[in-house]
Swiss-Prot record:
Lineage of origin: Eukaryota, Viridiplantae, Streptophyta, Embryophyta, Tracheophyta
Main location: secreted
Keyword set includes Secreted: yes
Subcellular compartments: Secreted, Cell wall
The protein's name: 40 kDa cell wall protein
Species of the source: Solanum lycopersicum
This protein's UniProt keywords: Cell wall, Secreted
GO cellular component terms attached to this protein's record: extracellular region
């Protein structure tokens, strides 16, 4: 989810 992007930058982001 959009939250993970900010915290992990991996879950939904390209990480």
């Amino acid at each position: 989810g959009p939250v993970e992007i900010y915290y992990l930058q991996s879950a939904d982001a390209k990480g």
